[in-house]
Amino acid sequence: MAKNIQAIRGMNDYLPADTALWQPIEAALKQVLASYGYSEIRLPIVEQTPLFKRAIGEVTDVVEKEMYTFEDRNGDSLTLRPEGTAGCVRAGIEHGLLYNQEQRLWYIGPMFRHERPQKGRYRQFHQLGAEVFGLAGPDIDAEIIMMTARWWKVLGIADHVTLELNSIGSLEARAAYRDALVAYLEQYKDQLDEDCLRRMYSNPLRVLDSKNPQVQALLNAAPRLSEYLDADSRAHFDGLCRLLDDAGIVYTVNERLVRGLDYYNRTVFEWVTTSLGAQGTVCAGGRYDGLVAQLGGHATSAVGFAMGLERLVLLVQAVNPAFLPQRAVDVYLIAAGEGTQSAAMRLAEQLRDALPTLRLMTNYGGGNFKKQFARADKWGARIALVLGESEVQSGQVNVKCLASGEQQTVAQDQAATLLATLLG
């Protein structure tokens, strides 16, 4: 017997039981995006490798260790996208969407990073991202944070996420801070772990992200990024904080929050949760005003964020399972007897015409009434419609509530009205 071929480690199949959980969450996210005026853009999952090296930064964990990069048959270096912002900017430049224009775009789909698979973090994972181009003020930063806060309310998880906020200033301010931080860390090289030693010269701000308790203790006395902020960045951040205060958005200023991609400037933020065990990031983003020009476009202000859907689904499951569907179908249509199958199919189509959102499954494959009722239970139906030979002849249908056992017989042309009442 041939050996079974299995999915690649860290790249998962999402079975019907999984997609049933994802679909209502995705629908809620998209509805909120539409209410803020965002438009969908669909992007390739494969891009030229230089795009990510230029955008993310060559001296980052993503580029150095995590990207899936390969040569195609023409010898071109291609990469499975590890994140969505770079591709969105590339598309905006290529199609003339960004020059002297305001754009609000969103995308959703798989991303790829070669990391150690663990709960909520996989090598193929899914993100929803949103990007705003052409607006420079703190007001749009505040609005995208308010939009994410609305998501948490809609999904019923607002009490389980907290907002962390920081400003990393301009490129020049970060360069000055970088020098000060390196000078400080050099005094304690013997206390740094291997990862921090590597980052100290290549990307020292990433040392601030270290989870090593000994390094965290060292950083308590390190220079603070806020001490090096330029005046414009400080004013921008103060304006953002005032707007969030006025909107009632609770946040914590975390001066060690820097984000792992080189293109960020000024505002950076993360929504984090502790409801899945150790603290994890659910949604993160910030401002990247230099990226469009860096990738060949005209200088364009930009801000955006991305959210990991795997972790979001886990969080909704953990703290608000009532948001998720408990059954696959609402109504199961049972038919048994001579000539009942075609009548059942006609009735099913009539009901779908009358009730477009009704989840109705018709029994196929025969079987007596007992077996068909068992199938209705298996699919989680609330109501069974029963057509026997007598119902077909009389133009009626039996409507049975499976939880209570109550049933009534109505004319087939009245079935839609009754179902709408019973299902609420």
From Swiss-Prot:
GO terms for biological process: histidyl-tRNA aminoacylation. The keyword Manganese does not apply. Keywords: Aminoacyl-tRNA synthetase, ATP-binding, Cytoplasm, Ligase, Nucleotide-binding, Protein biosynthesis. It catalyses: tRNA(His) + L-histidine + ATP = L-histidyl-tRNA(His) + AMP + diphosphate + H(+). It comes from the Bacteria. GO terms for cellular component: cytoplasm. It is found in: Cytoplasm. InterPro entries: aa-tRNA-synth_II, aa-tRNA-synth_II/BPL/LPL, Anticodon-bd, Anticodon-bd_dom_sf, His-tRNA-ligase, HisRS-like_core, HisRS/HisZ, HisRS_anticodon. One of its GO terms (molecular function) is ATP binding. Its EC number is 6.1.1.21. PROSITE patterns: AA_TRNA_LIGASE_II. HAMAP family: His_tRNA_synth. Homodimer. Belongs to the class-II aminoacyl-tRNA synthetase family. This is Histidine--tRNA ligase. It comes from Edwardsiella ictaluri (strain 93-146).
